[in-house]
């Protein structure tokens, strides 16, 4: 693709030496890495703004409204403020590890975007083991958190790091078993392959074509909340118990890196869920043959192909925002649970249910999925059930609001 772009720009690369082509590849990889980190930072900042606006709406207050329209650029002001603060390192801290810990976390976060498909061709690397790669690189985040807690030479930071390590290691098991459900349904570990095995319509998504896949999604979603240290699983940063947990001794730029990753993970976990269970970037009325026809036979694709790529990205972002709202809703609704409750939930409930979903999906694929027209029929029935459940929930919510004499205030949005 890079060589094709250079040829289209009038650059003849046929006579370049092997060293020159290798140097060009290194430059391209460096630019790609910079783009990924910058993109992750922008995603994190916009997620902060979105959560603050949604949480303000939920609590009938204004929220961000000073810097930019509807406070949209407030996250930039916050980032500049953190960058200009004094960077303090405790006198008794392990200075090398204290400095390195935020970069472990940042690298683990940024590497996820390599295999995350934002569109039909909008992916840095379509790895044939994409979901396995994402599971592996996200483990770097907990390494950084544990190193941050240890190197701070503070009991509160150490307790926070140890809690995070125990939490992530425990919830990786149900998350991994839940991920195996869409892998079994699609027959591939590739993120793009998992998306292409689904369809654009809701009754073609993995979450609705198999009753056990919806349960697997719920397990995966809860496990991702725990791995991301989100309420009600924010025990590593519990202010009432550990000051700020592993972040207690961090300030300025290094604190900003942790902050960036924490909010960026909200987007990542929602995007992974959309990819595995909700059809990813699939665009209605635009199947693979439409993308292939728009691509054409030339070195560089035409305008129609780029339009389809934009449409697929918008579909992916819209689905991700829906799940992101659910994450925000959970945070501002549920209280923090205790450590023993967190571990009991994982080992006594999520792990057994995830294993049952895995085995049941195995049997479903062998005995039921091969029957013609099974997927659309099951998908349609589950879609109707989901719509009925959603309207029932909204009706119950409206009844509860009326019963207590409360009102929904739209004036502050």
Curated annotation (Swiss-Prot):
It is found in: Cell inner membrane. The chain crosses the membrane at residues 23-43, 104-124, 129-149, 175-195, 205-225, 258-278, 310-330, 349-369, 374-394. GO terms for cellular component: plasma membrane. It catalyses: a quinone + NADH + 5 H(+)(in) = a quinol + NAD(+) + 4 H(+)(out). Keywords: Cell inner membrane, Cell membrane, Membrane, NAD, Quinone, Translocase, Transmembrane, Transmembrane helix, Ubiquinone. The keyword NAD applies. It comes from the Bacteria. It holds the Pfam family NADHdh. One of its GO terms (biological process) is aerobic respiration. It is a multi-pass membrane protein. GO terms for molecular function: NADH dehydrogenase activity; oxidoreductase activity, acting on NAD(P)H, quinone or similar compound as acceptor; quinone binding. Its EC number is 7.1.1.-. Signal peptide: none annotated. Belongs to the complex I subunit 1 family. NDH-1 is composed of 14 different subunits. Subunits NuoA, H, J, K, L, M, N constitute the membrane sector of the complex. NDH-1 shuttles electrons from NADH, via FMN and iron-sulfur (Fe-S) centers, to quinones in the respiratory chain. The immediate electron acceptor for the enzyme in this species is believed to be ubiquinone. Couples the redox reaction to proton translocation (for every two electrons transferred, four hydrogen ions are translocated across the cytoplasmic membrane), and thus conserves the redox energy in a proton gradient. This subunit may bind ubiquinone. This is NADH-quinone oxidoreductase subunit H. It comes from Anaeromyxobacter dehalogenans (strain 2CP-C).
